[in-house]
Amino acid sequence: MAYLSRATATLARQDCSNGCSASYAEEEELEASTESYDEEGGSEASTQTFRAKDLIITKADVLKKKPDPSSLVFGASFTDHMLMVEWTSKYGWDKPHIKPFENLSIHPAASVLHYAVELFEGLKAFRGVDNKIRLFRPDLNMKRMCRSAVRTTLPEFDKEELLQCVLQLIQLDREWVPYSTSASLYIRPTFIGIEPSLGVKKPSKALLFVILSPVGSYFSNGTFSPVSLWANPKFVRSWKGGTGDFKMGCNYGSSLLAQCEAAENGCHQVLWLYGKENRITEVGTMNLFLYWINKDGEEELATPPLDGVILPGVTRQSILELGEEWGEFKVCERHITMDDLSTALEENRVKEMFGSGTACVVCPVASILYKGQMLHIPTMENGHKLSSRIMAKLTDIQYGRIKSEWTLELP
């Protein structure tokens, strides 16, 4: 019997006049095209995967001092152990190994160092109000990681087996999960090509590893503090047919120059635009939502579609599903241009704008610097009722204040 049920996000989206994304059903078809799946036994490639039952555990002799949850800097502290699994085209997957946290030793010609043959994921473990440790929708992260592996020509693996190994890693380092409802344990699975050759080719060697980091707020200005955005069409994050809808390091390293310019202009994050119409796509490391009154006079929660340009975020999907469940306003995946936003602001039709992501959960937007003009977004003045409600709902689920099928409890 499979450890996790498959994601069943097949909600019908409203057919918006400005164009909608491929449905979740189509996304399932994409997965089926790269993986033959059997509900009882996992993928057909399972015989070529590593197995959690073969996991080797080597415990650290000396344990590190754990940081104070109230003073955590995002991604700066790491737990005592890590998970590593090696792969070669000749022998397939080696046994997974949990070992003391250590530096990696790879060949200077490793393909990850020269050609960015790499992908990663990001999810969290939360210590609930009942002291139980929960993961939030980890099946979606594993599914996305497998999808990225296909795009990167890295070997496939059974996502359920990886999740089982990750759970054992967290179990071993469970005291690193902060005793706090404002902090969590960030989980970073990473998959790299380590082909020791300067040839540009599919790697014959790869390394999958997972590290853990106790974290507080992602933004230095604190949890649920509004951010300012810098929008400049001279920079493009992704394009159709590219890799922008995959969780790959190359998408983030190439964004740093724009992020530096945003900071120089007094803004927290980059608002990425696309095409001649300057369509809104993503915000830095977040998906973007606009809560407004649309041109038809309807109260609407809108977000850019999954058209190959933006990352299919887990938090994004969860917010769409919550909106559909509440049924209090229209929920739509649609293209939104800067002209659409500017016009709506002039006509006082914008209620809130906010970003979403694993790191921040929900982050309100206060302003956008665009073409030398600061556009004021009235998120905070309007009471940020929807973004606050979404934030409360998701964190209540994550910290166990509300029972939900979206969480996976550690035994």
Curated annotation (Swiss-Prot):
Instruction: State the needed cofactors, names only.
Output: pyridoxal 5'-phosphate
Q: Which reaction does it catalyse?
A: L-leucine + 2-oxoglutarate = 4-methyl-2-oxopentanoate + L-glutamate; L-isoleucine + 2-oxoglutarate = (S)-3-methyl-2-oxopentanoate + L-glutamate; L-valine + 2-oxoglutarate = 3-methyl-2-oxobutanoate + L-glutamate
**Does this UniProt record's set of keywords contain Transferase?**
yes
Report what the Swiss-Prot or TrEMBL entry states about this protein's PTMs. Answer: The N-terminus is blocked.
Write out the GO MF terms. Answer: branched-chain-amino-acid transaminase activity; identical protein binding; L-isoleucine-2-oxoglutarate transaminase activity; L-leucine-2-oxoglutarate transaminase activity; L-valine-2-oxoglutarate transaminase activity
Q: Does the keyword S-adenosyl-L-methionine apply?
A: no
Q: GO CC terms for this protein?
A: cytoplasm; cytosol; mitochondrion
A Pfam cross-reference name: Aminotran_4
Question: What does the entry state regarding organ or tissue expression?
Answer: Brain, low expression in ovary and placenta, but not found in liver, kidney, and skeletal muscle.
Q: What this chain does, per the record?
A: Catalyzes the first reaction in the catabolism of the essential branched chain amino acids leucine, isoleucine, and valine.
- The identity of this protein, by name, is Branched-chain-amino-acid aminotransferase, cytosolic
Name of the gene encoding the protein in the UniProt record: Bcat1
